[in-house]
Amino acid sequence: AAAFASRRKQVVGVDINARAVETINRGEIHIVEPDLDRVVKEAVEGGFLRASTTPVEADAYLIAVPTPFKGDHEPDMAFVESAAKSIAPVLKKGALVILESTSPVGATEQMAQWLAEARPDLSFPQQAGEQADVNIAYCPERVLPGQVMVELIKNDRVIGGMTPVCSERASALYKIFLEGECVVTNSRTAE
């Protein structure tokens, strides 16, 4: 969120933690991360970043939630499912949804299925291919604590859409702030 807002894009960060939302809206951060405090403060003061506990209508949605392991060592996709279902009511034709959470192969398609079930009035790549109303992609976030701002901007990113159009749209979005290369592929390969 901060990386996009630092490029003067309107961003609404969504978190279920009301304390984190309040902290961000004061222009402060709730984690320790070099340079992030300055970027958030400037973005909030400039009117480019705000936080909310509920999703709002947007052109693009990035889902970055935990994907812990269950007791049987299987990934727990409950947070991804919850996030997808929370944005579904505010999705509109032309929206782009990108999953950034570390996820197993097939997770992006599963997320698209949850969205399709919640919004039968919209078409998704698994149904409509290139003509989908909503584009879906996967772009794993890979950063080291203490270097988040530098790595978000400088690192190469693997971006995989469910269709070539989805990949192109996701790549164009990340190029707003990314100085590294966008390595474009499909969602399963990116996962």
Where would I find each of the regions flagged by the language model?
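Short acidic low-complexity segments
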Residues: 45-58
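Rossmann-like NAD(P)(H) cofactor-binding subdomain of soluble oxidoreductases
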Residues: 69-142
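Short glycine-/small-residue-rich Rossmann-like dinucleotide-binding loops
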Residues: 65-67, 102, 163
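A generic structural motif
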Residues: 8-11, 49, 132
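NAD(P)+-binding Rossmann beta1-loop-alpha1 motif at the extreme N-terminus of oxidoreductases
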Residues: 1-27
